[in-house]
């Protein structure tokens, strides 16, 4: 975690100096993507066992 933060700080500063709106937009996009991915993953995991059971019963 510490290593990542150190390597990330310079990149963030550069993106900010280039264009604040652009960095903000990319950040929001990445956040929404990670959220949707985690949600879909949890749903698929909980769904897969149920589907298997239903298929066996049918």
UniProtKB/Swiss-Prot annotation:
What are the boundaries of the region Disordered? Answer: 1-58
Cellular compartment(s): Virion
> GO molecular function, one example?
DNA binding
Cellular component, GO, one term: viral nucleocapsid
Q: Describe its PTM?
A: Probably phosphorylated in infected cells.
Basic residues compositional bias, start-end: 1-19, 28-58
Q: What UniProt keywords apply to this chain's record, in alphabetical order?
A: DNA-binding, Late protein, Phosphoprotein, Repeat, Viral nucleoprotein, Virion
The function of this protein is: Thought to be responsible for DNA condensation during packaging of the nucleocapsids.
Name-wise, this protein is: DNA-binding protein
């Amino acid at each position: 975690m510490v290593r990542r933060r150190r390597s990330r700080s310079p990149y963030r500063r550069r993106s900010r100096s280039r264009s604040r709106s652009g960095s903000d937009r990319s950040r929001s996009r990445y956040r929404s993507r990670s959220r949707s991915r985690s949600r879909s993953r949890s749903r698929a995991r909980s769904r897969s066992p149920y589907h298997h059971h239903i298929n066996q019963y049918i």
